[in-house]
């Protein structure tokens, strides 16, 4: 079995940091002008531009019970592909879907991310929290 590519390991470190609420660790794993493309018809869909905006977006996920679990992660010098389960558990909601995330990496840090959920309706329900 071959050793995991360092970019795949960097993605795993970011996912692990998210799970424990360590946004400072995530800050070190993304470039200043990072862009995440979040699909859907929910209020948080769209492009998230910049590290500060991304960290604020991630901070906002805690109250909606968002979670993620990797199935597999592949990487090379420029890209990472993460096959994951993502979902939310909160009062009245217990939903999940499989998601493919494609990342562009530069110098071991995330530059851009695209999410491709298998079930668009479930994906929207994950983020459809009423405040």
Feature roles, as predicted:
Residues 1-131:
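C-terminal and inter-domain tail/linker signature
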């Amino acid at each position: 079995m071959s050793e995991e590519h360092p970019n795949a390991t960097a993605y795993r470190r970011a996912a692990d940091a998210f799970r424990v609420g360590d946004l400072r660790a995530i800050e070190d794993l993304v470039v200043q002008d990072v862009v995440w493309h979040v699909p859907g018809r929910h209020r948080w869909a769209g492009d998230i531009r910049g590290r500060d905006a991304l960290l604020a977006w991630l901070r906002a996920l805690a109250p909606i019970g968002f979670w993620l679990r990797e199935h597999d992660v592949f990487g090379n010098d420029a890209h990472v592909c993460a096959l994951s389960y993502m979902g939310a558990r909160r009062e009245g909601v217990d939903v999940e879907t499989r998601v493919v995330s494609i990342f562009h990496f530069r110098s071991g840090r995330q530059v851009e991310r695209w999410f491709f959920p298998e079930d668009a309706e479930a994906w929207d329900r994950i983020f459809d929290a009423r405040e």
